[in-house]
Every structure is written in structure tokens, then in C-alpha cells.
């Protein structure tokens, strides 16, 4: 995320995007919680993760579950499929802070909370609250800030539960149309709500939003529905119509097909982010807020989780 803390430079700088990473996950491989077992007739998600960092990672940053300053996790528990994305606020770089470490630690804490015996999979906002509390109450907490979007699909009622704070977000696609889409939470243009652990002596200098401020929603799902979580590197560069065009081109919903579709989305978003003449969603929003921006895409890290709702064959 190229954004401000409370002091934001007027113009954004462009960076080359040179590195791609990918991850695929068929739900169930990470199932570790022992408290109950899944029914063989329960719905499940076929999930893939794809992303690009806007520039090559520096030595020592090549950890899993990061695309630049973005992070993510995918977990499968007996009660729910769980996923999340987080976008570290890039303004921390000016203070010599790894802007992506906070996002990674936040996602790791949320992922760990899903393995507790009392996790029921129906309140991702409570999951975000618990994950942030774990992170912020460490003896030596990681300094930084991040947006967050969490989603769970509960197996028993095939319902998607979401919690979104900031300008990452989610989509539910059914029969080629967007059925549900999250709404951004921002303080100002390019200044999203963000969870923050500030330095002890400078708390007044940062936006410190609460995880309780995350917007929660629930949506009934059907087999064949697509669920997409992404950071703003996707949404700021790719119009919804273009995203749908790629997703609707999927011939099947297997792991390989989803990965191919996710890769096409990420690559197209990356291409648009470097196009100085393209009227991107970000450029349009800048004009609407009377912000000086030359137009074109917004170079940024891009993280995408794409899932298809499936039911076992009888």
C-alpha cells in the first residue's frame, strides 16, 4: 500500500514490478484442529493464492505468505474455511520500519487463533480482534499498521462471514455477476482505516483504528460461487468489469483453472498499474477528491485469494 500515516507526499512514485510468487491450496491440507471432524457431505472451498510484489524483495524478506508489504493466510478447520489478507502501510518505510512485517504478524496471529478449541468460524471480526490483541500485547510488539480483510465459510450453513477494515476487500461472484462487494473505509483519499501498534512515545502521530470498527457481513453461498479477497493493489488498478471478464472466462472450477484465472487477474492488474495513460479506479478516485495525480495505474503490491464453493460428489 502506498499511503500516508498522517503525513502523505503529494505525488506517488512508480516502481517496476519484477517478482511473482504463487501458492495453491486445496482445502483440508492445513486441517489441524482436533476438536471435531468434517462431514464428507459438507461444502468446501477450492482455494488458490496469487500475488506480485511491486519490486524485488530485499535479502532476508523471502518469507512465505508475503507479497512485498502484503500478507495473507488460508486455513481449514473442522467447522470453517478461513482466509485473510492484510496490506502493510507503506509510510512506515520512511521511519526505517519493514512495512510488511506488521501485516505478516497480524495474519499469523489470526491464523493461530483459528486453531483454538473455541473457534466457531462465524465471527471473523472477533477473530480479527483476538489476533490484533495477541499481536499488540506482546512483550515486544511489532511496530506498524495494516488494513485487514478476513472471511470464513462455515461448513454447516454454507454461509460466508466477513470482516473488513480499510481498503482491502472481497467480492462474491455468482452466475457471472457480482453479488456482494465490500465497501472501503477511509479517513481521507488513500488513507484507509488501519490497525496500528505505534511507538510508545509517538502514539498521537498515527491513525489507531480499532478492530471492532471492521464492517461485518454474512452471505449465503451456493455451489459454484466464487469468493475473492484482495488488497487494494488489485482494486485500485482493475475495474470490476475487467475482473469479471477474466473470472467469467474460467471453464472449470478446479485448482488448476482457478490458479490460471488468478494469475491472469494479477498479471493484468500489474500491467495496468504500470500504464501511465490508463484511467484506473485509483486515478478516477483521485480526481473525485481533487488530488493532484497524473493519471494511470498505481504501482503496488497485489495479493489475491480466489475460492470456488464446491460440494462433494455423492
UniProtKB/Swiss-Prot annotation:
Cofactor: Mg(2+); Mn(2+)
Binding site for Mn(2+) 1: 87-88
Enzyme class, UniProt record, top EC level: hydrolase
Keywords: Hydrolase, Magnesium, Manganese, Metal-binding, Protein phosphatase
Domain PPM-type phosphatase: 43-309
GO molecular function terms noted in the UniProt entry: metal ion binding; protein serine/threonine phosphatase activity
One record GO biological process: dephosphorylation
CC terms in the record's Gene Ontology section: mitochondrion
Annotated catalysed reactions: O-phospho-L-seryl-[protein] + H2O = L-seryl-[protein] + phosphate; O-phospho-L-threonyl-[protein] + H2O = L-threonyl-[protein] + phosphate
Keyword Magnesium tagged: yes
Classification via SUPFAM superfamilies: PP2C-like
UniProt keyword annotation of Hydrolase present: yes
EC number: 3.1.3.16
Residues annotated to bind Mn(2+) 2: 87, 232
Similarity comment text for this entry: Belongs to the PP2C family.
Protein name (database record): Protein phosphatase PTC7 homolog fig
Protein source organism: Drosophila sechellia
